[in-house]
């Protein structure tokens, strides 16, 4: 299979794809990576499936999110792309944006219904990913949007635990504050 060949086209049977279609799909994935919102809009209006996936299960939203292109993400979501589709590794677009530190992308995803608590199969959330890489602004923003600082992954670790394990003292401290504030009775 060629790099970025579409492994799956939603709603269609798995038929062999022509080399021409594979080359076209590869170009489309590059358009998402580059964040060319106008070209994506044109292609979507012409019938491009908004949830097109490559051979790794990455959607156009995932690729645009991971590369920090909020306008491209917005266009895809306005064409009914699913903001929570995971790739073959179980990663969500919001987790990819949190890893890279792209707050405008996360804002766009959340404004279009992405699950702030959407977890990968190992239970890791976007908050945990941001915490691991000491992205304080991301951690604060995700908490302000409802991310649970006390959520645990499949191994029983919280975002604070992940931050401490990765040597991310700033986010570990911020998460400790958030956890304490959450456990305090209202008005105290």
Model-derived regions, located:
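Ankyrin-repeat-protein effector appendages
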Residues: 1-28, 144-145, 154-157, 161-188
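Conserved ankyrin/ankyrin-like repeat signature
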Residues: 39, 71-72, 104-105, 137-138, ...
């Amino acid at each position: 299979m060629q790099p970025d060949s579409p492994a799956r086209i939603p709603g269609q049977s798995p038929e062999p794809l022509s080399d021409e279609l594979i080359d076209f799909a590869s170009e489309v994935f590059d358009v998402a990576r580059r964040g060319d919102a106008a070209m994506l809009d044109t292609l979507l209006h012409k019938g491009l499936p908004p949830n097109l996936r490559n051979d790794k299960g990455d959607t156009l939203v995932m690729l645009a999110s991971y590369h920090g292109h909020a306008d491209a993400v917005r266009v895809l979501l306005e064409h009914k792309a699913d903001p929570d589709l995971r790739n073959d590794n179980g990663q969500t677009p919001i987790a990819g944006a949190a890893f890279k530190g792209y707050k405008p992308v996360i804002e766009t995803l959340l404004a279009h219904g992405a699950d702030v608590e959407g977890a990968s199969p190992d239970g890791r959330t976007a908050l945990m990913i941001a915490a691991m890489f000491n992205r304080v602004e991301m951690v604060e923003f995700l908490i302000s949007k409802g991310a649970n600082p006390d959520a645990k992954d499949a191994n029983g670790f919280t975002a604070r635990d992940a931050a401490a394990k990765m040597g991310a003292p700033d986010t570990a401290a911020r998460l400790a504050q958030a956890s304490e504030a959450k456990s305090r009775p209202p008005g105290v």
